[in-house]
Amino acid sequence: MAVWHSANGKVYLPPSTPVARVQSTDEYIQRTNIYYHAFSDRLLTVGHPYFNVYDITGNKLEVPKVSGNQHRVFRLKLPDPNRFALADMSVYNPDKERLVWSCRGLEIGRGQPLGVGSTGHPLFNKLKDTENSNSYIKSSKDDRQDTSFDPKQIQMFIVGCTPCIGEHWDKAIPCEKERQDNRLCPPIELKTTYIEDGDMADIGFGNLNFKNLQESRSDVSLDIVNETCKYPDFLKMQNDVYGDACFFYARREQCYARHFFVRGGKTGDDIPDARIDNGTFKNQFFIPGADGQDQKTIGNAMYYPTVSGSLVSSDAQLFNRPFWLQRAQGHNNGILWANQMFITVVDNTRNTNFSISIYNNNGALKDINDYTAEQFREYQRHVEEYEISLILQLCKVPLKAEVLAQINAMNSSLLEDWQLGFVPTPDNPIQDTYRYIDSLATRCPDKTPPKEKEDPYKGLKFWDVDLTERLSLDLDQYSLGRKFLFQAGLQQTTVSGTKSVSYRGFTRGTKRKRKQ
């Protein structure tokens, strides 16, 4: 018999004060028909693929680490459009509006041929292959081997006006009442940090701080054994209320398990057996071997694969092709606040490592009679080549109270850059100014000079690219500009000395009837 009961749960009331709504930039940004093309130089970097090379004292960095598995984070600096000497001053009213940039398209160019890179460790913790074992595994004091493999294949780029947010797992601080012994596994936690230029990407071993959590220094390859592998925190960036960190992104990852190994060393977490709770777990996970058998002493269960990125093909490339931004995933639809843009790139499909051999002894190569390996020094180098092109649209921000209130809550420094800060009334309109302030006859100058504007990303490492003098209105003179004009049926016109883009319609011819 069904009986109705009143709800016993809590009654939730709406908040007494309304929650501030964040507007999309499309609701208050006014776009113009003026477009600029920006492009960088050919960006090159050369280094060692696995580690930094220092001199014998350790004070001088001789060769930096440059790996195809690293993140490249480009910080593009754009000119301030409010300081432009526009030929047509009717474009905007400086008393009521401010100009900003909007990204409408970009192309990330990549040089160098496709290639598969190899990484590894000369003392890799690989006890034995567990996929096709023909005898029971016995461990010794040191079972490390010289092992190499190819990393997971990854192509990815993330575009925004703030740095990309990454995530990784790191050692956590345990509770005081549960303070553990240093010999036991520490607790771990997920940490969120900015991805900087040079941070390693995941190559198949996860996004982990290997420096803190793998003290054997033999569980992963050389290029990440002393590093932290980061992965973009797409969940956090997609739910960002302003959407500045990620306008859009493109990603392609692939891998498969090529080899299956087992770790050597003492097992930290034993398989539950008869020793627990007076035999409750006896024969629950395994049945012990007989006396005299190798299986009497159970082996290690620390299984892991080494992955492979498999085929590298030009048919699945994200680079050297244009991308157009019509609608961003967040509230910021491509507006480049503070006149800067961040592009985070990972591409290990061009991961070839050069091998360079140099004759070690005095004399010429023609004087060598017999080959001896000790006569030659072997070096490794990796190179990266980039080129970035942008299509920028000039936009206007109305200086209205509700718009300025949201911008102030988002980033108050923007209003200071626009010279809209509050200016207090001076107490005394007459100030003292000395002529020879540095001479011995006058007092010392102020000990606290005016403080310069501090970089909000001070201390973070980026690849700075200055585009302040790399803008052009002649879109048809550049490859990406022509693609932008043609793909939407646009044409470029000049009005009052200012070049703008207008729509050019296409008319289809009348289809002729086929004769019967």
Swiss-Prot record:
Keywords carried by this UniProt record: Capsid protein, Disulfide bond, Host nucleus, Host-virus interaction, Late protein, T=7 icosahedral capsid protein, Viral attachment to host cell, Viral penetration into host cytoplasm, Virion, Virus endocytosis by host, Virus entry into host cell
Protein family per UniProt: Belongs to the papillomaviridae L1 protein family.
A biological-process GO annotation: virion attachment to host cell
Protein name: Major capsid protein L1
Gene3D superfamilies: Major capsid L1 (late) superfamily, Papillomavirus
UniProt gene name: L1
Superkingdom, natural source: Viruses
Subunit organization: Self-assembles into homopentamers. The capsid has an icosahedral symmetry and consists of 72 capsomers, with each capsomer being a pentamer of L1. Interacts with the minor capsid protein L2; this interaction is necessary for viral genome encapsidation. Interacts with protein E2; this interaction enhances E2-dependent replication and transcription activation.
Compartments where located: Virion; Host nucleus
Role description: Forms an icosahedral capsid with a T=7 symmetry and a 50 nm diameter. The capsid is composed of 72 pentamers linked to each other by disulfide bonds and associated with L2 proteins. Binds to heparan sulfate proteoglycans on cell surface of basal layer keratinocytes to provide initial virion attachment. This binding mediates a conformational change in the virus capsid that facilitates efficient infection. The virion enters the host cell via endocytosis. During virus trafficking, L1 protein dissociates from the viral DNA and the genomic DNA is released to the host nucleus.
UniProt GO cellular component terms: host cell nucleus; T=7 icosahedral viral capsid
Species assigned in the record: Human papillomavirus 36
GO molecular function, one term: structural molecule activity
